[in-house]
Amino acid sequence: MGDWSALGKLLDKVQAYSTAGGKVWLSVLFIFRILLLGTAVESAWGDEQSAFRCNTQQPGCENVCYDKSFPISHVRFWVLQIIFVSVPTLLYLAHVFYVMRKEEKLNKKEEELKVAQTDGVNVEMHLKQIEIKKFKYGIEEHGKVKMRGGLLRTYIISILFKSVFEVAFLLIQWYIYGFSLSAVYTCKRDPCPHQVDCFLSRPTEKTIFIIFMLVVSLVSLALNIIELFYVFFKGVKDRVKGRSDPYHATTGPLSPSKDCGSPKYAYFNGCSSPTAPLSPMSPPGYKLVTGDRNNSSCRNYNKQASEQNWANYSAEQNRMGQAGSTISNSHAQPFDFPDDSQNAKKVAAGHELQPLAIVDQRPSSRASSRASSRPRPDDLEI
């Protein structure tokens, strides 16, 4: 027969995108069909017409009797069977190549969007859409293609068509030949003058090969049915698993992420904290009574108290004249208070500081005590 290398290379690529049952089916196809057909079976049927003899001298009688007994050669019939049962697998391979081509386009587009993202362009929605498309096509990391969606449907359809072709060819073979060969065939057909007997060479050997190919066809059909049930139950299992842990819940393509890592501090001004009512370092049993954070008087108090605190601190440092004892900027901590209309303005320019986590229990200095005891015209009455 002809060269099977082209078909073999194509079918070999399917193994990377098939299930375990599909790989076994391909092994059976390669070893017990293509290899056996190209070596032993072809030599056994090589002289089928030349060794076909009839007990008549009438010209043309042997030809018409051979045509009646064997409308198509067994070898050519099995070649057609292999081609037909391989076509659905090749169509599935074409779908895999289509998905891989889609993957290349999506990866290229994703790289372009990431380059635009580095320039400050907001492309988060487009990147999420690309992730959804990859999931839809069954594309995973490192170029791996998972059987999902349209690819899974194509695979199931290919299994169904392979099974149908196997059954159809078995029925056709049984209708034309049966599953055994006789040593003598009786023929009565023009131009034969009368009923003649025709003799077949090596009928027992050919019958053994026919039975062997029949068993291989039945094994392939059984593998197709088993694989069909396996893919069906695996799809149901993945669907149930997907409902319990859906894709959008794990990736969240359109839902904004929540920032749960913000620090929580206590505010000792009678107003509520923007993040938490109590400091994580507060002693056990400690409770802080806070006011309503939406209260306008509370917000005004926050701003005025912050300005007054910094004014008192600057005046105290100026009176002391001790530049070496000035607290470094890394240890200074302003107060941060919520504002529903807009973010709180920075009080000290160039210093982005954090709110106090705990109350400083150190005693006040003597200069600070004298400075704080003097009344100032701009002091707040609290």
From Swiss-Prot:
Family the UniProt entry places it in: Belongs to the connexin family. Alpha-type (group II) subfamily.
Subcellular localization(s) per the UniProt record: Cell membrane; Cell junction, Gap junction; Endoplasmic reticulum
Positions of post-translational S-nitrosocysteine modification: C271
Modified residues (Phosphoserine): S5, S255, S257, S262, S306, S314, S325, S328, S330, S341, S365, S368, S369, S373
Renumbered residue ranges of the record's region Interaction with NOV: 244-382
Upper taxonomic lineage: Eukaryota, Metazoa, Chordata, Craniata, Vertebrata
Sequence ranges on the Cytoplasmic membrane side: 2-23, 98-155, 229-382
Membrane-spanning residues: 24-44, 77-97, 156-176, 208-228
Intrachain S-S bonds: C54-C192, C187-C198
Main location: membrane
Record key words, sorted: Acetylation, Cell junction, Cell membrane, Disulfide bond, Endoplasmic reticulum, Gap junction, Isopeptide bond, Membrane, Phosphoprotein, S-nitrosylation, Transmembrane, Transmembrane helix, Ubl conjugation
Biological role: Gap junction protein that acts as a regulator of bladder capacity. A gap junction consists of a cluster of closely packed pairs of transmembrane channels, the connexons, through which materials of low MW diffuse from one cell to a neighboring cell. Negative regulator of bladder functional capacity: acts by enhancing intercellular electrical and chemical transmission, thus sensitizing bladder muscles to cholinergic neural stimuli and causing them to contract. May play a role in cell growth inhibition through the regulation of NOV expression and localization.
InterPro entries: Alpha_helix_dom_sf (IPR035091), Connexin (IPR000500), Connexin43 (IPR002261), Connexin43_C (IPR013124), Connexin_C (IPR034634), Connexin_CCC (IPR019570), Connexin_CS (IPR017990), Connexin_N (IPR013092)
Keyword Disulfide bond listed: yes
Pfam families assigned to the protein according to its UniProt record, in alphabetical order: Connexin, Connexin43
Disruption phenotype annotation: Mutant mice die shortly after birth.
SUPFAM superfamilies the UniProt entry points to: Connexin43
Species this protein is from: Mus musculus
Tissue and organ expression note: Expressed in heart, non-sensory epithelial cells, and in fibrocytes of the spiral ligament and the spiral limbus. Expressed in bladder smooth muscle cells (at protein level). Expressed in astrocytes (at protein level).
Membrane topology: Multi-pass membrane protein
Regions of this protein lying in the Extracellular compartment: 45-76, 177-207
Modified how: Phosphorylation at Ser-325, Ser-328 and Ser-330 by CK1 modulates gap junction assembly. Phosphorylated at Ser-368 by PRKCG; phosphorylation induces disassembly of gap junction plaques and inhibition of gap junction activity. Phosphorylation at Ser-368 by PRKCD triggers its internalization into small vesicles leading to proteasome-mediated degradation. Sumoylated with SUMO1, SUMO2 and SUMO3, which may regulate the level of functional Cx43 gap junctions at the plasma membrane. May be desumoylated by SENP1 or SENP2.
Protein name per Swiss-Prot or TrEMBL: Gap junction alpha-1 protein
